[in-house]
Swiss-Prot record:
Component of the acid-insoluble organic matrix of calcified layers of the shell (at protein level). Keywords: Secreted, Signal. This is Glycine, glutamate and proline-rich protein. It comes from Lottia gigantea. Disulfide bonds: none annotated.
Length: 419
């Protein structure tokens, strides 16, 4: 019996020891599990620290290259660095928040870098402003692009208004505003504005500025104001002589070139009576070159009349200016003065040319004055009733070119021979 009791007690003790051992084993396993979690957590923090370090380095690289090279390559390098960190980090929510903080830090560093770059640019601008030379010393177009230019062998006369450039011989891209670079002549010939010193010591010693002429009395070169009552013929752009007119001198060409040659051939005869043309021009406010050009067209300045005692057109017209008593209704008044006299030139300028110009003003009041003058020249040949339009005013005149030929000859006398 005692033996049985001793055996039971031994078995109970063993069972108790086994229970204690099992409980201790479970507790040890739990502690081991807790140690592994702590170890993994510690390992994760180390990964985060390494990733944070990589991010800071990448942010500095991005800032440096952003200043010198641009953002494209830097973003690729930064993405590679982020990839390396991501492979070891895992995808925890807390780690993503850590990444967000690092990114904000990188952006702050980049903004700081941009501030430094702006500061360096400000220093460069400050050094530039300290220089004694202004930016105008380095940039800006030439003061006068028109000066020194030439076209078809003609040098420029400078920048003027387009309507003042004779024959519209200009280039409109070399001058400021609406001015053009002219290569012929300034038919307006406006007086220059006087130049006043910027800081005169005694303003009372400055000469008075010259008077500026009214726009309606502005004159062309070689055009005294006494010749400008009926418009400026130098503003006209005549077509010149027809081929039929050019055949008088056996010319193989027509136009303004032919008119120039015809009046050049008459110059010696015209110069014999130049004083007569000048006086008639002053008396009736018409340029003497226009009067002489009519004489050149009518009788070649008188060359055709020496052998006919002053008669032309088959004996119907008389004198250098060719007064047709029948067609004009003047009768014997046409022969009141010798055919080659100054009185004859003055008379025909008055009672025929000036009379027809004034009739043009009444018939075509809306025409510019220089076209009314040209219409009067056309009427000198074919009558006032024949002048209907500006473009067709020579239709029906001798060879259909009368005023275009006469005006071209007159302009030649002014431009080439100083009339």
């Amino acid at each position: 019996m005692k033996c049985l009791v001793a055996l039971f007690l031994s078995l109970s003790l063993v069972a108790c020891q086994y229970d204690d051992y099992d409980t201790e084993r479970k507790n040890n396993n739990m502690l081991s599990s807790m140690n592994i979690l702590d170890l993994l957590d510690s390992f994760g923090l180390n990964i985060k620290a390494r990733i944070a370090h990589v991010r800071r380095v990448a942010g500095r690289i991005r800032l440096t290259l952003d200043i010198g090279l641009g953002n494209g390559d830097v973003e690729r390098e930064s993405e590679e660095a982020e990839g390396e960190g991501t492979d070891g980090r895992g995808g925890g929510e807390g780690e993503r928040e850590g990444w967000g903080g690092e990114r904000e830090g990188g952006e702050g560093e980049r903004e700081g870098g941009e501030g430094e770059r702006e500061g360096r640019e400000g220093e460069r601008e400050g050094k530039s402003s300290e220089s004694n030379e202004s930016p105008e010393d380095f940039i800006g177009p030439p003061v006068d692009m028109c000066a020194g230019e030439s076209r078809r062998g003609s040098p420029s006369i400078g920048c003027i208004a387009a309507e003042c450039c004779q024959h519209s011989f200009y280039i409109n891209s070399l001058c400021p505003g609406s001015s053009v670079c002219c290569f012929s002549m300034d038919v307006c010939d406006r007086l220059p504005v006087p130049v006043i010193p910027p800081f005169p010591t005694d303003p009372g010693t400055l000469p008075p500025p010259p008077p500026i002429p009214d726009s309606q009395t502005t004159v062309s070169p070689n055009q005294p104001s006494s010749y400008m009552c009926h418009g400026d013929f130098m503003k006209l752009m005549p077509k010149g002589a027809d081929q039929r007119t050019a055949r008088q001198d056996n010319l193989a060409y027509a136009g303004v070139r032919a008119s120039n040659k015809l009046v050049d051939n008459d110059l010696a005869e015209l110069n014999k009576r130049k004083d007569c043309y000048v006086q008639a021009g002053k008396n009736h406010c018409i340029h003497p070159a226009v009067i002489a050009a009519i004489a050149s067209r009518e009788t070649r300045g008188g060359k055709l009349l020496y052998s006919t005692n002053g008669y032309g057109d088959g004996g119907r017209a008389y004198g250098i200016m060719q007064c047709d008593g029948g067609a004009s209704g003047l009768g014997d008044i046409c022969k009141k003065y010798p055919w080659d006299s100054c009185e004859h030139i003055n008379q025909l300028t008055d009672i025929i040319l000036l009379n027809y110009v004034n009739q043009m003003k009444t018939k075509h009041p809306s025409w510019p004055a220089h076209y009314q003058l040209k219409g009067g020249v056309s009427a000198y040949n074919a009558g006032v009733g024949n002048v209907q339009t500006i473009a067709g005013m020579d239709a029906g005149t001798t060879n259909d070119d009368y005023s275009n030929d006469v005006i071209a000859r007159a302009q030649r006398l002014v431009n080439a021979h100083g009339w």
